[in-house]
Amino acid sequence: MSKKRLNEIARELGVSSKEVVAKAQELGFEVKSHASSVDEASAKRLAESFGGQKSEATKVAAKVSKPEKVDETPKVETAKVEKAKETQPVVKEEVAASAVQSASHRPQSRNFKAEREARAKEQAAKRAQNQGKGGQAKSDQDRRDNRQLGQGRSNNERNDRRDNRRDQRPEERKDNRFGDRRDNRDNRRQDNRSGRLARFEQREAAKPAGPKIDFKARAAALKAEQNAEYARTSEERFRQAQEAKKQPKKPKEIKFEEPVVESKPFVKPALVASVPEQVAETTVDTRRKKQARPDKKRDFNSDEEDGPRKQQRNRNSQNQVRNQRTSNWNNNKKNKKGKANQPAKPVTERKFHELPTEFEYTAGMTVAEIAKRIKREPAEIVKKLFLMGVMATQNQSLDGDTIELLMVDYGIEAKEKVEVDNADIERFFVEEGYLNEEEMTERPPVVTIMGHVDHGKTTLLDTLRNSRVATGEAGGITQHIGAYQIEEAGKKITFLDTPGHAAFTSMRARGASVTDLTILVVAADDGVMPQTIEAINHSKAANVPIIVAINKIDKPGANPERVIGELAEHGVISTAWGGESEFVEISAKFNQNIDELLETVLLVAEIQELKADPTVRAIGTVIEAHLDKGKGAVATLLVQQGTLNVQDPIVVGNTFGRVRAMTNDLGRRVKTAGPSTPVSITGLNETPMAGDHFAVYEDEKSARAAGEERAKRALLKQRQATQRVSLENLFDTLKAGEVKSVNVIIKADVQGSVEALASSLQKIEVEGVRVNIVHSAVGAINESDITLAEASNALVIGFNVRPTAEARSQAEADDVEVRLHSIIYKVIEEMEDAMKGMLDPEYEEKIIGEAIIRETFKVSKVGTIGGFMVVRGKVTRDSSVRVIRDGVVVFDGKLASLKRYKDDVKEVGNAQEGGLMIENYNDLKVDDTIEAYIMEEIKK
């Protein structure tokens, strides 16, 4: 059974919802509001209770729906007026018919739209009648009179009338007007919709049936005609457009807004009687919106919250929210009106820029930078790149190849800009225009003395310098490069002494790279040794001529011929045998044939034609560097080109500074150093690396910028090298986590010794252990080194340096081990022993006994106890056991307890009985075999 809501019943009966709800409650229905539902019987009963009211409401609706009769004064009728009179009854009949039809099934309400349309048609008919005999003037006069009459009315009278009408309303309507407003609005909408539908059906039925028109065919024919006309005129329009482009454009004149003056059309006088000239006003359509009159003032004194508007003071500050809302509304209205009245701004055309013929680019330029350079929009370039298959944004950097392809697409010749890297020191060594060929002068040769350990290199140099250098070296071996300069026959020769030990390979390679020729010292009694072969390879790699000095010919076992033959096997052939190397037999200890050796050196240097330009800024190589406690960073430099002066701004490796002081090989202070001159300088910020190049800059500012940039690049390179992981070294990286490492901090007197010691320690091969160099530097062991060693659990090794008093006391307090050495052999041996001791001990299994389970006992809260008898060896309390059943190991673990009778014992011997319990295992069975074993450490 269907149900109806009370509001639907109220709509059908034409009464308010409240009345229906009240009536339903009176009849005893359980309802709460107009949304409550009742069944059909209850709805019928409720409708019968409103029977009298329903018929009365229907009469009222029918009466309201009829339009008011308009008085018409007989005038001179024209054809237009007659037509309006004929159509007017039809409209009335349509409105009445629609009203009656809608009132039959729903409550009738006023159709305001139909009434407005009827009134408008009547007014139009009146105006048409008055036009013939001067009626227009009379109508205008009547309207002016009515307007003047309306102006005389005061606002107070209008307010009084509104209040009176409000008081005269019935109480029921006052109370119910807000509740029924929504229902009335819905009723009006339904009535309007039904009325429009009825009128449309009547008009359609009244139309005579004409021939059927094919609108699609007519539209297609019209479209074809328009296309044909457009095609005929397209050529003419194109020509006119081209001519318009060629003509210079005139600037648009800005038209100022003129005040709007209401037009007063001239009205012809009537022929019948002379009528005084009247000004006709413009017809105003009052159907849509009520037009505001400028002379009409409104006063809403009764509706103001703060009293009459005229009596308010400082009204803007009393209600800021309302004022803000009102001001926003007014601004919006003004803006809307202003936009319509403002003249259109002249549109400035974009200037057309010609593309450049050449474009100089650098790799990494962004799309925005390129667009700015070639005067194009970034979006245009992004589109071209997209068509080329490159997805880019305007802030994305492009590589050189992409930029060149883009310029080819634009038809521009692209050239890569060559930027000079101010931080690049190497360019001074390779630039052709850096040296002036006209200023080239002869320079002293740089000679490097190489050879195996204890073959007499330092003794030879000592003899050349007439000094005792070898006595100052620890262990009698040279452990860093010495640079010295001597004079022979009025010509200077610079000597570099390199270590012969295997740990100093990098130092020998460095010496060979800066030298002009090499003196290879070979002992006549020892012959060719491993470091001798290495020195030969370094010299050949540097393309340096070799002079062989066969030393120790005074010894009884000397055999120079054997040495010549061994060297020939390694590619060093004597000139006597048709080779290119000079051989000189000497005795450095007894000063034999030393002069002949020097003459040979000068002869080979003269053949090479060694020259340098002393006028340019100095460039060269770092031979050695160390940190002095009083002087700071001290670097031994070899000037290769130019002249080095005191106070020169200099960049050395990854550091910079100004030459504060300069001393020669004899320890004397000098102010200048020419080509091929070794000097020691101070004034650097940090200690450079041996083998770094140096260069003098124009000013300290550029030197500082270059040094900081080089330091930044070196740090970035180091970080990239440590963080880079590839598929190739991934396994090694994972495996390194299983290897034990010993952390070491190295401090030495010179940079070369630091490098040699670090390289030697990392080459120690002990399986399972590796050396990790935490920190290495030049200088004495200080407190920061001890702090770092404590934090990283490292060992501090000092090579030819001593710890400070503060560092020594801190090391004792923090229990940090510090080892001091002066011989590299002892450092390597000591580290090997320490690394071997770090290895995890290796164990092997040893079976000590075997027993058979004879009986089992299950004890609550304890577990299973196995009674056994030892059949071989013994079973100890600390041994591990295996439970073997039918030849299969079913459990492997530790003993929980071992007893003999009721006593706990440490072991049970052969052929003895006892009881045992196994940890975490209670499944012992008779005839199980118990195998006892221990793990013994394997001694290395």
UniProtKB/Swiss-Prot annotation:
Its main location: cytoplasm. Residues 497-500 are annotated as: G3. Residues 451-458 are annotated as: G1. This is Translation initiation factor IF-2. GO terms for molecular function: GTP binding; GTPase activity; translation initiation factor activity. Residues 551-554 are annotated as: G4. Keywords: Cytoplasm, GTP-binding, Initiation factor, Nucleotide-binding, Protein biosynthesis. One of the essential components for the initiation of protein synthesis. Protects formylmethionyl-tRNA from spontaneous hydrolysis and promotes its binding to the 30S ribosomal subunits. Also involved in the hydrolysis of GTP during the formation of the 70S ribosomal complex. Belongs to the TRAFAC class translation factor GTPase superfamily. Classic translation factor GTPase family. IF-2 subfamily. Residues 442-609 form the tr-type G domain. It comes from Streptococcus suis (strain 05ZYH33). Residues 476-480 are annotated as: G2. It comes from the Bacteria. The gene is infB. Residues 65-95, 112-125, 155-206, 232-258, 292-301 have a biased composition (Basic and acidic residues). Residues 48-264, 278-351 are annotated as: Disordered. Residues 587-589 are annotated as: G5. GO terms for cellular component: cytosol. It is found in: Cytoplasm. NCBIfam families: IF-2, small_GTP. InterPro entries: EF-G-like_DII (IPR053905), IF2_II (IPR044145), IF2_N (IPR006847), P-loop_NTPase (IPR027417), Small_GTP-bd (IPR005225), T_Tr_GTP-bd_dom (IPR000795), TF_IF2_bacterial-like (IPR000178), TIF_IF2 (IPR015760). Residues 314-332 have a biased composition (Low complexity). GTP binds at residues 451-458, 497-501, 551-554.
